[in-house]
Amino acid sequence: MSAVFRKEFRSGLTSMTGAIFMAFVLILNGLFVAYYNFISASPHFEYAVIAASFLSLLAVPVLTMRSFAEERHSKTDQLLYSLPLTATQIVLGKFFAMIAIFAIPTAVVCVYPIISEAYGGGEVNLATAYGVLLAYYLLGCAVIALCMFLSTLTESQVIAAVLSLGVILVVYFLKSFSSMVPTSEIASLAVVLVLALACGFIIYAATKSYIAGGVSGLVLVIAAVVVYVVKSSLYEGLIGKILSAVSIFSAIESFANGVFDITCIIYYLSLAALFIVFTVQSFEKRRWC
């Protein structure tokens, strides 16, 4: 795994995509810190980080698009399969390399609270500032894991980047859509059924097994219908709750109140782990295709 990590980390640092990614993250965070903490003379560093989180992470597809799509396109993925490593070790090596690259601009941003306190709008709460930076970094790790999984679904870097960017945009605006959706029980059931089928498709895409995808989707559909029959009141307003829950960019907003939200930390770690598992399954399935 260390060999994969060193190769990917070195490649990320020496390639144009890695440089563009790190520069974009630093520039976006720098602009928001300059506006919030210097121009507006606000001591709340966490506001700048939260405001910059979405825009700065739009660059993640640039970093992840080549992780697996390029390997498939150039047929070098066969070399990965020949290594004396498991699929999990290969995926983790690539993932750790990408989050290590993301850690570089994040480490630079960690200096900003000290600069803001010295030359900005007042005394900065360093505990809150570094708490939100931890959440920001873990949010980035979760987004990297998501985009890495999407990269395994295609052999085109461009398609991988566009697909990842589209998913990030959809996820970001989910919370805004939550207030616009119907709250009736039957509408919620319909959405849950669609999500159940979508989960079945995702499992199929990751495993390339019609049985795994079909059975999973069918089980979820049956479970949703049974719950509706037994206690339909659970479905009232469920669509909005689901949209708010999967909007990963809104979870970090709790840090704006100076609260270290441990549930947010666990949420991001769980998301990263989930998409790493999906990536491993998708990568392992192609070994036998």
Q: Locations of the language-model features?
A:
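Transmembrane helix segments
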Residues: Y35, Q157-E253
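Hydrophobic alpha-helical transmembrane segments
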Residues: M1-E70, A129-L134, A161-V162, A190, F201-K208, S216, Y228-L238, ...
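Secretory targeting signals
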Residues: N29-Y36, S40-A48, A52-L55, F96-G166, ...
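Helix-loop-helix units of permease transmembrane domains in multi-pass membrane transporters
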Residues: S67-A97
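Short amphipathic alpha-helical coupling elements at transmembrane boundaries
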Residues: A3, K7-S11, Q78-S82, T152, ...
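Short aromatic-rich membrane-water interface segments that cap or initiate transmembrane helices
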Residues: L126-A135, S250-T263
